[in-house]
Swiss-Prot record:
Lineage: Bacteria, Bacillati, Actinomycetota, Actinomycetes, Mycobacteriales
Function according to Swiss-Prot or TrEMBL: One of the primary rRNA binding proteins, it binds directly to 16S rRNA where it nucleates assembly of the head domain of the 30S subunit. Is located at the subunit interface close to the decoding center, probably blocks exit of the E-site tRNA.
Pfam family, one: Ribosomal_S7
Protein name per Swiss-Prot or TrEMBL: Small ribosomal subunit protein uS7
Naturally occurring in which organism (per UniProt): Corynebacterium kroppenstedtii (strain DSM 44385 / JCM 11950 / CIP 105744 / CCUG 35717)
Highest taxon of source: Bacteria
Length: 156
């Protein structure tokens, strides 16, 4: 075990266009093969498309979408004796945001629209309206936690 304690969490810089760290995180999740400018073009294009469709601030739409996708509970495997139990645990705020962004981008890639920009915009709009595959993933995660509530006393 290190004697110095845990390393401090790095602060992510705000993105240059909207001045928000959530947008920076989204850009980093969309990033493939280190092509940051391509990822920025995709994210900014999707946010601009959201602005045109809703007529509101796209960052607020993104945050609303993330609030609808963020899980509050998840299950983690815990081995007790010879059995492995799925133990429901609360999700820390930072992890909830990370999971929400991960799911949003994962289900964006599975959509059928033509360009990645269109897919991301559609998934953000669906999630902000409580629809879409990423919101369904959160519901499934919560159902799994509820189903395994009997094992909650194994929490650590």
């Amino acid at each position: 075990m290190p004697r110095k304690g845990p390393a401090p969490a790095r602060q992510l810089p705000k993105d240059p266009v909207y001045g928000d760290t959530i947008v920076s995180q989204l850009i980093n999740k969309v990033l493939v093969d280190g092509k940051k400018s391509t990822a920025e073009r995709i994210v900014y294009g999707a946010l601009e498309s959201c602005r045109e469709k809703t007529g509101t601030d796209p960052v607020l739409t993104l945050k609303k979408a993330l609030d609808n996708v963020k899980p509050t509970l998840e299950v983690r495997s815990r081995r007790v004796g010879g059995a492995t139990y799925q133990v429901p645990v609360e999700v820390r705020p930072g992890r909830a945001t990370t999971l929400a962004l991960r799911w949003l981008v994962m289900f964006t890639r599975q959509r059928r629209e033509n360009t990645m920009t269109e897919r991301l915009a559609a998934e953000i709009l669906d999630a902000s309206n409580g629809l879409g595959a990423s919101v369904k993933r959160r519901e499934d995660t919560h159902k799994m936690a509820e189903a395994n509530r009997a094992f909650a006393h194994y929490r650590w």
